[in-house]
Amino acid sequence: GSATVTGTPKQLASVSKFVASDGELKLKLDPEKLSDVVRKGAPTLLKEGKDAKIEIVDHTTPKVVPSEDGVGFDEGKLAESAAEAATTGDRKVEIATKSVPAKFTTEDAEKMGVKEVVSSIETPLTNDAVRTTNLKVGTQKVANTLVKPDEEFSLLKALGPIDAAHGFVSSGVVANGFNSTALGGGLSQLSTNTFNLGYRAGFVDVEHKPHSKYFSRYPMGMESTLWEGKYDMRFKNNTPYGAVIDTWVADGKVYSKLWSTKYWDVETSTSKPYAQVAPTTKVNPARDCEPSGAGGPGFTVTVSRKVSRDGKIHENSSYKWTYSPTNRVVCK
């Protein structure tokens, strides 16, 4: 096909500048800006390539969805020809289209080595249906996310804005040590699951923060809260292979798997709770205060991880986390 694009004087002025060359002023057009003018003028003729994707079918089988080439043109040649034509009588330029490969091709996807489960976790849901809505929305947004070698995964970035316009609802959270509600309440369960995927696969723990209070549905110490603008959950893929996150809600649980090629041998362990602190009574002056009785004591745990390959230790680390007691809450 073909198309005619007519640039207005205002458009051409916005992409033009004069530069000194051999004692003369010569017209130079910005290739990128001029190309944008052409693309907007011929939207049906030109198209972006479509990147390949790696999807986990039925949570059992990795599948490469092939890339599609786009239709484009030589931007540099267009700018040169247009600058030359601007000084001639007819001011017309003919430019041939060409096939433009996607940024991430089918071949690129196949080289990622996504073939097996390298870590997994399942955690039980609460009986709060509203909270479960957030987890269903959240897992759908995160599922089939590809983390390339040396790439960092950010859960907040993968989820996008946590607001009502994007399907999230208000549910229970812990704010300043007290129970409250906020948009996206419950997403810390997804944060916990995805943290465990990266941690158990030997990936770099870039950022995670356990809860201030312990919830028995999560692995002690190996869990992660999430709060937009404050606490993210991030890990970095430190292997030569791509990794795809598969996560979903079913049968009263949040399931998560990390698909890749096994690279690291990983051993994790959590100490028994120590340094226990008995609960007390706390006064919550907040307007949305929820009174509650005392629960379990506070305590500290130490989480350790040894990451090795071919018998050589790559990392031998540990961290401590202290949980607050579940205090009796009185509203004032």
Residue ranges and their predicted role:
Residues 1-332:
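Well-ordered beta-sheet/strand-loop patches within structured domains
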